[in-house]
């Protein structure tokens, strides 16, 4: 009897699973054939390819479609290919797609759970409004002297070590961004150029890497989304949470006891704890931690890809050095904030590195209010409803390498950004996202990467070391776009 019940349950389960696989067919939306149980993401489940690589592959296969229907396990998901539709989702119809497909309970992960990236609805809106004043261009000018100091320390650090060894680019850039975030967010010297493994680096090495059991939970939640509400999942390791909380607590106390005012993000948070009774110490800690994790990691990823591309493309490196040298030479061997803003070729090279290697390879939005998809006249699809709760994917990696928008899409050619008319890459080049949910730290991230690279190019000739495995393949597991094997660079002092 039990056997019969189990058989009936399994057969009905299989039947229902297969039934769901007709979801897109019924609506006439094109898409790749799903594999039973895993849907279209088998290569990610088997740790062969990153999700961003997979979405981009699917994006590329369906050249003539505005959207592609796929299955994550047996859940229907939409990949949006059309820039006009992307504009609608991120800007015009934002009220239908205002949340990210990410879930962290702030009672379980109090630091990242309070981060705007993970927050939803009204809570996201009010937190974003609270933090936005910390990222104005005025505030960037405020922290710029700290960034200059850290950049000079970077040059001294490379200088000291380059005789004996070449550098793992990501690690070098991470030391730089950790020091700059330490200075600009916490008002502290993170000592990443002095010690081999200082506390900030230990925290940085572990922050975004869910360990053991948490990684298994993350995988299960991805496969079976209903588990989100049943399984307690955290990204921030417990000991990292304790260390960061202590750093913030001590800094706030020290400032209070000694009446210290510094030009940094912590001062803004400190003021909020004094002026807003709803803003508690745990909020200050969470937002300082948010600045920490978003500030060092994405920027160090971008910076190391930019250095790699400059090392691999000598012509671009030389041209960039001419621009940078001129600015330093005309300003007493310094690079003032206003001068950095004028470096158009540096800006183009930065954008081109972001185009080729966007750290966030895909954006996953959730439909928060049913949305009617209206096809164009030449489409073979009827109008249909994108239901509340459906996940829509914007494949940044797919868009950024689409030959329809970028000629020779796999080549590093900063000139394309110089020649382009304003806004011509809108909604096809969007490394920071678009619309109300776009990256809050874009100004700070761009500033620290550009100043760090400017100081390096001013002082060193860089080349790719033979230890680098080419062509670069992306890590299938890490949540950001990162090479599976490290990029090694050689530095030759020229000044
Ligand atoms: C160059 C480096 C960076 C890149 C490429 C980058 C990219 C992104 C992307 C793609 C998003 C998602 C946008 C969306 O959902 O539409 C995002 C969100 C966010 N980023 Fe960045 N980011 C960078 C640096 C930073 C820095 C330095 C900070 C802060 C110090 C920061 C803070 C945030 C926050 C708070 C969000 C969530 C915004 C929201 O949901 O309202 N980012 N970033």
Annotate each PLM feature.
Residues 44-64, 246, 250, 335-380, ...:
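Conserved cytochrome P450 K-helix E-x-x-R motif and the immediately C-terminal K′/meander segment
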Residues 42-43, 49, 57, 136-138, ...:
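Conserved cytochrome P450 catalytic core segment spanning the I/J/K helices
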Residues 314-316, 425, 442-480:
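Cytochrome P450 heme-binding "Cys pocket" and the immediately downstream C-terminal segment
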Residues 394-421:
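Conserved cytochrome P450 K-helix/beta-meander segment immediately N-terminal to the heme-binding cysteine loop
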Residues 133, 289, 382, 419-449, ...:
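Cytochrome P450 heme-thiolate "Cys pocket" and heme-binding signature region
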Residues 2-112, 122, 126, 148-157, ...:
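N-terminal membrane-proximal hinge/A-helix region immediately C-terminal to the signal-anchor transmembrane segment
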Residues 32-57, 76, 103-186, 198-253, ...:
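Cytochrome P450 catalytic-domain helical core, especially the substrate-recognition surface
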Residues 177, 181, 186, 240-248, ...:
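Central I-helix of cytochrome P450 enzymes
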């Amino acid at each position: 009897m039990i056997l019969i019940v189990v058989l009936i349950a399994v057969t009905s389960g299989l039947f229902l699973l297969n039934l769901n696989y007709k979801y897109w067919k019924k609506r006439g939306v094109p898409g790749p054939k799903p594999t039973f149980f895993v849907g279209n993401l088998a290569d990610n489940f088997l740790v062969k390819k990153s999700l961003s690589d997979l979405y981009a592959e699917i994006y590329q296969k369906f050249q003539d479609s505005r959207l592609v229907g796929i299955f994550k396990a047996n859940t229907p998901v939409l990949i949006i290919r059309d820039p006009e539709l992307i504009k609608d989702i991120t800007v015009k119809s934002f009220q239908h797609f205002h949340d990210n497909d990410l879930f962290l309970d702030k009672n379980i992960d109090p630091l990242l759970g309070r981060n705007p990236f993970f927050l939803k609805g009204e809570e996201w809106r009010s937190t974003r409004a609270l933090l936005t004043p910390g990222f104005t261009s005025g505030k960037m000018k405020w922290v710029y002297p700290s960034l200059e100091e850290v950049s000079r320390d970077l040059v001294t650090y490379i200088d000291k070590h380059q005789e004996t060894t070449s550098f793992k680019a990501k690690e070098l850039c991470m030391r730089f961004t950790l020091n700059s975030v330490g200075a600009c967010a916490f008002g502290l010297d993170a000592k990443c150029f002095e010690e081999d493994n200082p506390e900030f680096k230990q925290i940085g090495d572990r922050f975004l890497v869910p360990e053991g059991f948490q990684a298994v939970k993350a995988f299960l939640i991805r496969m079976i989304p209903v588990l989100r509400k049943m399984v307690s999942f955290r990204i921030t390791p417990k000991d990292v949470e304790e260390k960061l909380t202590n750093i913030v607590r001590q800094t706030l106390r020290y400032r209070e006891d000694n009446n210290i005012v510094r030009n940094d993000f912590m001062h803004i948070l400190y003021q909020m704890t004094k002026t807003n009774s709803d803003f508690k110490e745990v909020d200050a800690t969470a937002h300082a931690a948010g600045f920490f994790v978003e500030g060092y990691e994405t920027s160090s990823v971008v910076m190391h890809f930019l250095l790699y591309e400059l090392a691999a493309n000598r012509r671009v490196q030389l041209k960039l050095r001419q621009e940078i040298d001129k600015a330093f030479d005309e300003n007493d061997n310094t690079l003032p904030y206003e001068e950095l803003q004028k470096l158009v070729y540096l800006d183009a090279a930065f954008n081109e590195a972001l185009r080729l290697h966007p750290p966030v390879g895909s954006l996953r939005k959730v439909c928060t209010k049913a949305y009617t998809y209206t096809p164009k006249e030449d489409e073979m699809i009827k109008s249909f409803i994108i239901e509340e709760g459906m996940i829509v994917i914007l494949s940044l990696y797919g868009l950024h390498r689409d030959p329809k928008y970028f000629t020779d899409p796999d080549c590093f050619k900063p000139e394309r950004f110089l020649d382009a008319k304003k806004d011509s890459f809108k909604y096809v080049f969007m490394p920071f996202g678009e619309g109300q949910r776009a990256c809050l730290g874009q100004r700070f991230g761009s500033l620290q990467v550009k100043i760090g690279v400017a100081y390096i190019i001013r002082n060193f000739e860089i080349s790719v070391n033979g230890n680098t495995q080419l062509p670069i393949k992306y890590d299938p597991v890490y949540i950001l776009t990162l090479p599976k094997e490290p990029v090694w660079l050689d530095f030759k002092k020229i000044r």
